[in-house]
Amino acid sequence: AKKLTDKPFGVNVMLLNPNAAEVAQIVIEEGVKVVTTGAGNPGKFMDAWKQAGVVVIPVVASVAMARMMERGGADAVIAEGMESGGHIGAQTTMTLVPQVADAVQIPVIAAGGIADGRGMAAAFMLGAEGVQMGTRFVVAKESIVHPNYKERVIKAKDIDSEVTGMSTGHPIRVLRNQMSREYLKMEKEGASFEELEHLTLGSLRKAVIDGDVVNGSLMAGQSAGLVTEKMTCEMLIRKLVKGTEKQIRGSVFYE
């Protein structure tokens, strides 16, 4: 990232990963300015990050978690609904965002199911001050995700995602394929956590790096059905802003 820009950039730390502590330290050593966190509580890293001047923005799936993050020193929170891809909570974006916005004083960023100006404008109406999009940017031309993965997202329809891992307490939304069908079958038959973990070992890499869209984990949100073309990040952001402005200006309440 430093080779690409002299501007501030962010790093996402997945707290369930076994190397999370190592990544947390690298963030400090490399002078990263912004960190977003997911799949866990970043509390044990918060003091060190704040002392290093890092802006910390955790993903939250409940009002209680949002309040906890605010008390812990978070600069903002990402209220992520269950429409999102990857690890998800139990509430929808529509219900979660306004409740979190009412509960905390720090900025709220909406995530989950947002892929265009309509969703972005709706997020602002719900009380968010920004949005986070994953599925939409997965297919950006700058994304290093395998072309097969991108094509699968673009071809996805509104009902093509499903949730695996409910029995483990770590539900994950993915696009339906052979791996997800086998996972759900094993869950239904009462497979152990270890058996399910063995099935998914390395599955995300299979999809993202190797392009195996049959046996890999195709993490993507319900907004995949709205993603129909590839474009550069610059083009995408311009289109999003223009679309959002159009929706807001077209509102009967706009003055």
Language-model-derived ranges and their functions:
Residues 1-107:
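Active-site entrance/lid segments in N-terminal catalytic domains of soluble metabolic enzymes
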Residues 95-109, 115-255:
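Conserved active-site-proximal phosphate/metal-binding subdomains
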